[in-house]
Amino acid sequence: MFRRLLIATLIGILAALAVAAFRHAMQLLEWIFLSNDTGSLVNAAEGLSPWRRLITPALGGLAAGLLLWGWQKMNQQRPHAPTDYMEALQTDGQFDVGASLVKSLASLLVVVSGSAIGREGAMILLAALAASSFARRFTPREEWKLWIASGAAAGMAGAYHAPLAGSLFIAEILFGTLMLASLGPVVVSAVVALLTTHLLNGSDSLLYTVHLTVDLHAREYVMIVSTGLVAGLCGPLLMWLMTASHNSFLRLKLSPPWQLALGGLIVGLLSLLTPTVWGNGYSVVQSFLLSPPLFSLIGGIFACKILAVLASSGSGAPGGVFTPTLFVGLSIGMFLGRIWGFWLPGSDEIAILLGLAGMATLLAATTHAPIMSTLMICEMTGEYQLLPGLLIACVVASVLSRTLRHDSIYRQHAAEH
């Protein structure tokens, strides 16, 4: 057991380093190509001329598509191992290292160029890949899946500062591939990854800053649970829209470079209306939580952002859908909060409260992982007083969503990409 805990610690450190390497590569490329050192792609877009804002996502998509297409052409005759940690966990615990690195590099290109896709997909993949490489060299074959799971959980913890949610991400989303008794090393890896990330960043701050002073009573619990019901309906709708977008791109019969370029061009066109469509939505989520916008502004940004997410995901841009889902959930929750605010006092507080509820419940509705989703929002914001209400609402959202659509967003995304 001590040996496993030691390996879990080492994997946590490796995963944190992999996440940090991807983050620093993003910052470097943003500085080189966009003259941006703020870490915010929205700020980068605001500083560009309209024509550069239009073509940058398209060029990034084209470059990523050429990279993926070229790799596929070079390796057509070679047997393929998985390039996705979920697939690796469900097979024999091995990765195609070269293809995984190329996929991560392609993800880096589309993320840095402004596509509305999450960066956490590549971060978790690199963390799991680092864990797999270590495990194949130093551990017996029957443990490989455990260490890939530990690496994935540690990658989630490093990316989102949420070690408990990262561990439960493995337990809930990949249920059946691991015994509950194996979660000890997974938790250790996740916590060590978070501590290493804090050490590398020189800070232990929360991922999102929230100023919420509302007291929770029966009325607030009713609003939170009602948000869960709405999210339970919106989750399957979002996944259906993603599938429809993906199928629409496939019907165009474009080669991968042009398909990703088209997705990027759509994002570029939308960014002429509002630069907030660039990136995964992190900075927009933070600004909404600090200063909830009015009803009409939420609607305008939401409409443009959801179209950008559908264009990026549908075109096959390699990346995650986690943070974009958080933004969509936040917008839905704030919509509901503004509606409640027509009749109740403290409309900004209600908007923030239901925005957080929307983030958690839409995440639960799309991942079918209610406990992970609840803990994720609490760990990212520090608002642990919301845990009981969010847990009930997330279970409601997850059950309703699973009833309407069997597959989770991660299963769907893996099948399409």
Swiss-Prot record:
InterPro entries linked: Cl-channel_core, Cl-channel_volt-gated_ClcB, ClC, ClC-type_chloride_channel
GO CC entries: chloride channel complex; plasma membrane
Membrane-related topology note: Multi-pass membrane protein
Free-text function comment from the UniProt entry: Probably acts as an electrical shunt for an outwardly-directed proton pump that is linked to amino acid decarboxylation, as part of the extreme acid resistance (XAR) response.
HAMAP family the record matches: CLC_ClcB
PANTHER family: CHLORIDE CHANNEL PROTEIN CLC-E
Name of this chain's protein: Voltage-gated ClC-type chloride channel ClcB
The organism's taxonomic lineage, starting at the top: Bacteria, Pseudomonadati, Pseudomonadota, Gammaproteobacteria, Enterobacterales
Gene: clcB
